[in-house]
Amino acid sequence: GKKAEVTALQAISAEDRKDWISLAFVQAGICVCVPAFLLGALLAEAMPIWPAIISGSLGYLIVVVGMVATGMIGCDLGLASCTCCQAGFGKSGARFIVSTIFAVNMIGWFGIQNGVCGEAFSNAMLAMTGWDIPVVVSNTIWGIIMLLTAVYGVHALEKLDKISIPLLMIIMCYGTFLAFKVYGTGNLNDEGTVQSMSFMSGVALSFNFTAVGTITGPDYTRFQKSRKDTVKSVFYGVFPMGVITLIMGIVLTKLSGQYDISMVLIEVGLPLLGIIALVISTWTTNSTNAYSAGLNIVMALKLKDNRRREATLISGIVGIVLCDLGILGHIEGVLSLLSYVVCPVGGVILADYWVVGKGKAKNFRPQDGVNWAGVIAWALGAIISYTLVKIEFVGIIIGFVIYLIAERFIPSASRDNAENIA
């Protein structure tokens, strides 16, 4: 086997790049998680079945477009998300704003998902065997297992996902089939559903669930060999798995009132399969949270580049401790606020690379200090999207537009380059 991956922020060399199929599995692993089923449930409760499926799928399609747009930057440069920000934000801006926010966000989500998994594991074990495993113990054990995959790196994530995604698909399909058998199809006819959400709100909700992932896409696409491979791995990784999970969430909610496949399996009398589904779906997503957190911690704390493993370990342990102390129940609100702060970062990266730098890797110029155009665009994007629009991902568009205006007054290093070469 290969040794654990060491580097964090240096460009990934040509010989370390991977084929698109292995990264499609990693992308799929990120998409299948309890929140993805929850998305289906929220849509199912707010609209009839077809609008729910179509609006949710459309949201995922926008996610794919966004991920391809940021992912190609990661692939062109071979750089992680926070490093891709060094042009639009400047090196200090990327360090103090971007990597700090990303790290907090990822560590928080690692802890929250770990808590969901730990609690469900303890409940299921109690129901199945009568053993009362304290939730703190479950959290810690599973947290460490999920964390070690991330410490090992993308190679381990890819191994995990190649085994677990097919297994999860089989369990999910079987669970849905059983739900039909147990509950019948009577509840699918939508007579009782009052449409309480507009179609476009459904699309927005679906995008919001993965908005942050759209922007941290380069953490994985930097391992791709070409733009074409990036499109393939993102599309085939995100879209089918996202939509299947969404549809199952919708159908299960309509049938049984319970959206989480693992809970449905426990209710129809297959708790063991339920636990496996829960653990795998959390593991494949959560390892990537810890992995991305580690990359950002390296930048935020200005660690040596070969300290990625230690940084990942620290991030995960902080997440597990926060989870065990029960702090995370109080900060879910804070984390949803964070997506307002993360989204405009995407707008700045996209504007600097695709418009100012004309989409060419040779024009990408990390600049020392702070690029105020990026910081202003980011801050205004976050404030406007939070106060006026109240839709997180609009921050991407606002950040993008304001950066292009601000950059006219505070030219980016990427522009001088694009002009000199042209």
Language-model regions, residue ranges each:
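Transmembrane alpha-helical segments of multi-pass small-molecule transport proteins
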Residues: 26-29, 99-100, 126-152, 166-175, ...
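C-terminal membrane-solvent junction of multi-pass transporters and transport-like membrane proteins
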Residues: 309, 345-422
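Extracellular loop-to-transmembrane helix junctions
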Residues: 42-71, 93-97, 238-239, 398
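Membrane-interface "cap" regions at the ends of multi-pass membrane proteins
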Residues: 1-50, 63, 197-203, 222-229, ...
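Membrane-interface loop-to-helix entry segments
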Residues: 137, 141-142, 146-179, 193, ...
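Hydrophobic alpha-helical segments and their helix-loop junctions in multi-pass secondary transporters
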Residues: 150, 166-192, 206-210, 249-254, ...
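Hydrophobic, membrane-embedded alpha-helices of multi-pass small-molecule transporters
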Residues: 20-36, 177-182, 190-252, 268-287, ...
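Juxtamembrane transmembrane-helix boundary signature
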Residues: 57-89, 98-108, 112, 410-416
